């Protein structure tokens, strides 16, 4: 297959430019994550020192030290220069460490950790010996016990040694000022009045953009903008990342009274996920780009998405709940005419050569569509033309490329490919409102989504636009598929009606199962407020035991066969909403708070790029990170033990590396050098540097050279994402199962896969 170059140029020319023009800073930043170096990344060192999964890694500001936290409740400090272990600190945490960082501007003497025991601990390294591999237990200089659930992420502000932010699954983000109290009572304490709550989101989650926030937002991640430190980004148990301006938030409060969630500056969510009401859809990581202009979101059971922070009111990336149905509607582009061609491109050899490359890529993609093989390559070729950094290709070529990519996406059928195809069809219709291909492929996409009426409307228009016998036959075929799909839907509706009648009377409350074990648990009442039934979304449980071997799962999922069959049915939300709103609730004394809350935006920012290839379903700490000071590349861990690197601008896959025996969770790029640290389920940290002899798309880890077929590995990951499991449990339910031991004999043993 034909390959095409990256836009960052020849690395030798960059080095020469640095020597001639002495522009060290800019060139060094471009060199750090140059495409030729990314393609040469290989395992440099496997760093041993932990006895459990390594859940957190972070660099100090100079890049001389790496800190890590693990399930073994230890914090390790590593030397970057020789990859050696300097100190191993017994923290005193009673559960897994999920996050740890160096506190800025403290000469790397203060470190902070957050763990599954709901505590944030601060340690001073000033009295530690620099003797290597010294294992020591030191007392924390500060211990904050005010969270009631696991602390999943910490954030610090560059240049600020006084404040730490912690995000917890209890739905609060707290601000700890190190100049004030050095400790606080635990959340179970009757005198817990620690006023450190910056964001109270225990009623901040929403099922869709149109819904009011009323459920507990179980926080999984947070970040502070590196260029605008007043900007705070959080993500958790729904589809929406939220951007807040710390200057506009209410004063710090205690957790004794629940506050209405404050309005955010922006929501971030791909438009096709904004109306999904699946309780399993949630964010595992959110982060700012190095320049603070973009954010990266990683979803469980989904892909990684890039979005712009600064979108003005007229930006096409902004949308409201009312805009979502328009993406499926024929009238969305009505009245638009074909756009005028752009002005002529200046004639030069380089520009003409680049345009020739683009035309060749479009032709190659068209051949792939016709042949039906190498679909992934065809899509990436279209990505390069549509999203690449180059001269304007002209509306005609762009329209053709959009239609080809839409057709390839519909043929590939990976998760949410159908929504990406719809985006391309709508973009093509903006260029040419009379495009047969755009309307035909839109009809096919809507058919795949089961939106049969809308699909028929587009098929009718495509039939009117057909200019050949072949196109007329295509329309007739898809209309036949629509008729068959409608008949199948009617049949299924009738069967579902009969089945629902036979199930009547089998329901038990899920909260009965969960809270029965809680009554005798140390986590009951005082630790988790009874009001927190929002956490389970008050689902109903259809509880049936089954021992039939016919109900076994896919062998890849490693789930026990038929031991438990759980089906969930939601209650009517209307009763919940009224009880939630009418219940006791704290609020600021000023009456302006109610007015302020009514202005909570229902505007969200849509995606501008999707990164696909990895699998994120097994853990809720999986990161997606920018690589390099300019953030030109994006990386993510995966459940298959690999980690993936994409070019940020186009989404093009650059590298796939085998980094773990099971799962890669954490990826952190060195502040200045071309070096990347990764960790996961293994008890080691891997350091990756560009020392491979030749560039390649794959690289091995500790098991030796990676020889796996790239597209085959990605295909397996996508099947895992798309697998239609009969048993899909809300992860909140699984957390309760994990945290509470049921009385012996109460329930039969069973295993569940985290969704």
Which sequence ranges carry the predicted segments?
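Loop/turn segments within WD40 beta-propeller blades
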Residues: 57-63, 101-108, 155-161, 223-229, ...
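A short helix->beta-strand "capping" segment at the edge of beta-propeller domains
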Residues: 28-52, 82, 137-139, 267-271, ...
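WD40-repeat beta-propellers
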Residues: 75-80, 120-126, 132, 154, ...
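Alpha-helical adaptor scaffolds
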Residues: 366-431
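Structural hallmark of WD40 beta-propellers
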Residues: 63-67, 86-87, 107-112, 121, ...
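Short coil/turn segments within WD40 beta-propeller repeats
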Residues: 52-55, 72-76, 95, 116-121, ...
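Terminal intrinsically disordered, low-complexity extensions flanking WD-repeat/beta-propeller proteins
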Residues: 2-12, 16, 192-212, 217, ...
């Amino acid at each position: 297959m034909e390959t095409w170059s990256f836009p960052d140029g020849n690395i030798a020319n960059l080095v020469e430019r640095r020597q001639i023009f002495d522009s060290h800073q800019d060139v060094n930043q471009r060199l750090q994550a140059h495409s030729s170096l990314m393609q040469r990344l290989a395992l440099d060192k496997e760093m041993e020192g932990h006895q459990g999964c390594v859940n957190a890694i972070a660099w100090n500001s100079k890049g001389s030290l790496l800190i890590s936290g693990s399930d073994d409740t230890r914090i390790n400090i590593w030397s970057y220069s020789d990859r050696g272990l300097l100190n191993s600190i017994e923290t005193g945490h009673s559960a897994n460490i999920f996050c740890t960082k160096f506190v800025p501007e403290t000469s790397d003497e203060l470190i902070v950790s957050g763990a599954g025991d709901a505590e944030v601990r601060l340690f001073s390294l000033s009295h530690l010996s620099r003797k290597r591999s010294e294992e020591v237990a030191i007392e924390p200089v500060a211990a904050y016990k005010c969270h009631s659930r696991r602390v999943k992420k910490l954030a610090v502000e560059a240049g600020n040694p006084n404040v730490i932010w912690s995000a917890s699954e209890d739905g609060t983000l707290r601000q700890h000022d190190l100049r004030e109290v050095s400790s606080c009572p635990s959340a179970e304490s009757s005198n817990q009045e620690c006023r450190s709550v910056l964001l109270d989101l225990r009623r901040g989650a929403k099922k869709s953009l149109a819904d009011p926030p009323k459920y507990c937002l179980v926080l999984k991640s947070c970040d502070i903008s590196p260029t605008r430190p007043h900007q705070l980004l959080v993500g958790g148990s729904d589809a929406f990342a939220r951007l807040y301006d710390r200057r506009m938030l209410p004063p710090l409060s205690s957790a004794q009274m629940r506050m209405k969630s404050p309005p955010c500056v922006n929501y971030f969510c791909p438009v096709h996920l904004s109306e999904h009401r699946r309780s399993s859809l949630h964010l595992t990581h959110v982060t700012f780009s190095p320049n603070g202009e973009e954010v990266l979101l990683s979803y469980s059971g989904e892909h990684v998405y890039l979005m712009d922070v600064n979108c003005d009111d007229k930006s096409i990336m902004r949308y409201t709940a009312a805009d979502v149905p328009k993406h499926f509607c024929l009238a969305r582009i009505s009245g638009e005419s074909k756009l005028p061609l752009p002005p002529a491109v200046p004639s030069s050899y380089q520009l003409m050569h680049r345009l020739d490359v683009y035309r060749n890529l479009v032709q190659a993609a068209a051949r792939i569509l016709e042949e039906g093989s190498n679909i992934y390559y065809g899509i990436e070729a279209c990505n390069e033309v549509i999203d690449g950094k180059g001269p304007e290709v002209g509306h005609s070529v762009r329209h053709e490329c959009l239609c080809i990519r839409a057709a390839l996406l519909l043929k590939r059928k990976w998760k949410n490919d159908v929504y990406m195809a719809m985006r391309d069809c709508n973009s093509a219709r903006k260029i040419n409102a009379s495009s047969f291909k755009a309307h035909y492929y839109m009809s096919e996409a809507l058919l795949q989504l089961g939106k049969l009426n809308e699909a028929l409307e587009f098929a009718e228009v495509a039939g009117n636009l057909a200019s050949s016998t072949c196109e007329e036959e295509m329309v007739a075929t898809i209309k036949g598929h629509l008729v068959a799909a409608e008949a199948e839907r009617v049949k299924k509706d009738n069967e579902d009606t009969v089945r629902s009648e036979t199930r009547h009377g089998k329901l038990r409350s899920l909260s009965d199962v969960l809270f029965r074990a809680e009554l005798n648990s140390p986590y009951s009442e005082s630790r988790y407020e009874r009001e927190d039934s929002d956490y389970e979304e008050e689902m109903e449980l259809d509880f049936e035991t089954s021992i039939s071997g016919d109900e076994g799962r896919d062998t890849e999922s490693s789930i026990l066969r038929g031991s438990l069959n759980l089906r969930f049915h939601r209650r009517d939300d209307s009763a919940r909403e009224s009880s939630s709103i009418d219940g006791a609730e704290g609020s600021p004394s000023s009456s302006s708070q109610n007015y302020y809350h009514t202005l909570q935006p229902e505007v969200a920012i849509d995606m501008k790029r999707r990164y696909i290839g990895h699998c994120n379903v097994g853990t809720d700490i999986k990161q997606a990170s920018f690589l390099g000071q300019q953030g030109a590349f994006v990386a993510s861990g995966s459940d298959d033990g690999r980690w993936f690197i994409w070019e940020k601008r186009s989404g093009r896959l650059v590298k796939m590396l085998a980094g773990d025996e099971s799962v890669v969770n954490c990826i952190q790029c060195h502040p200045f050098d071309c070096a990347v640290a990764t960790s996961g389920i293994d008890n080691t940290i891997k350091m990756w540097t560009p020392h491979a002899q030749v560039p390649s798309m794959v690289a091995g880890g500790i098991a030796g050279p990676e020889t796996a077929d790239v597209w085959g590995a990605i295909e397996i990951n996508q099947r895992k994402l798309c697998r239609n499991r009969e048993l899909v449990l809300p992860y909140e339910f699984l957390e309760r199962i994990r945290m509470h031991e049921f009385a012996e004999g109460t329930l039969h043993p069973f295993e569940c896969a985290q969704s």
